Regions:
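Short boundary segments that mark the start of a structured unit
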Residues: 1-168
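Single conserved hydrophobic/aromatic residue that forms the stacking wall/gate
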Residues: 166, 173-174
C-alpha cells in the first residue's frame, strides 16, 4: 500500500528540519480498514531525541463498501428437494469480513415442521464475493396444502451496505 524502507535521515548543517517521504501510496479499489505507517526516529548523531520521536501517518481508505444482496429476489422448488441454498452476493471483494443479519418469515412453518432455518447472521469472509444461507430439512409431508413461502430479509450489515433486502422462496407440494 506504500513504500518506505528503514533508512537514515540527514539534516544538513545549519538546517533545522528534514523530510521523510512515504512514497507510492496505492489508490486501490479494495475496501479496507484505514492503515497506519509508524515512523520512529532513533540513534541520532550530533543531536538528541526530543519528546516527539514517533510519527503516525494514517492512510485513509477512500473506497466504498461493497453492496450485499441476494443473487436473485425469488426462487421455488418442490418440498421433496430436502434443502435449498440461497446465495448472497457482494458487489466487490473486500479486505474485511462482511456480516449481515437475516430474518426468516413467511407462510411456511419453521422449527422442522416445513423446514429448518432460524434468524441468523451470514459471514462472508474477506476476499470472497458470496455466501450461502441454507434452508435445510424441507419436509416432504403428505399433507395437501397450497404453496408456502419462506421470506428472508437482510438487515444490519457490517462492512457493506444492503441493496435487495428480501428474497421469497416458494415451496410447492409434491
Amino acid at each position: 500500500d506504500y513504500t518506505l524502507a528503514n533508512g537514515t535521515l540527514t539534516i544538513n548543517a545549519g538546517a533545522t528540519s528534514g523530510t521523510i517521504t512515504i512514497a507510492g501510496i496505492v489508490d486501490d479499489s479494495l475496501d479496507e480498514a484505514n492503515e497506519t505507517v509508524v515512523i520512529t526516529l532513533s540513534s541520532p548523531s550530533n543531536a538528541t531525541l526530543g519528546t516527539d520521536s514517533v510519527h503516525t501517518y494514517t492512510i485513509t481508505d477512500n473506497d466504498n463498501a461493497p453492496v450485499v444482496e441476494f443473487n436473485t429476489t425469488s426462487s421455488s422448488g418442490a418440498e421433496s428437494v430436502s434443502s435449498k441454498d440461497i446465495t448472497v452476493d457482494l458487489s466487490a471483494a473486500t479486505a474485511q469480513d462482511v456480516t449481515v443479519n437475516y430474518a426468516v418469515t413467511g407462510t411456511a412453518t419453521g422449527s422442522g415442521t416445513d423446514y429448518t432455518l432460524a434468524n441468523g447472521t451470514l459471514t462472508i469472509s474477506a476476499g470472497a464475493t458470496s455466501g450461502t444461507i441454507t434452508i435445510a430439512g424441507i419436509v416432504d409431508d403428505s399433507i395437501t396444502e397450497g404453496s408456502e413461502s419462506v421470506i428472508l430479509t437482510l438487515t444490519s450489515p457490517s462492512n457493506a451496505t444492503v441493496s435487495y433486502t428480501h428474497l421469497r422462496a416458494h415451496e410447492t407440494n409434491s
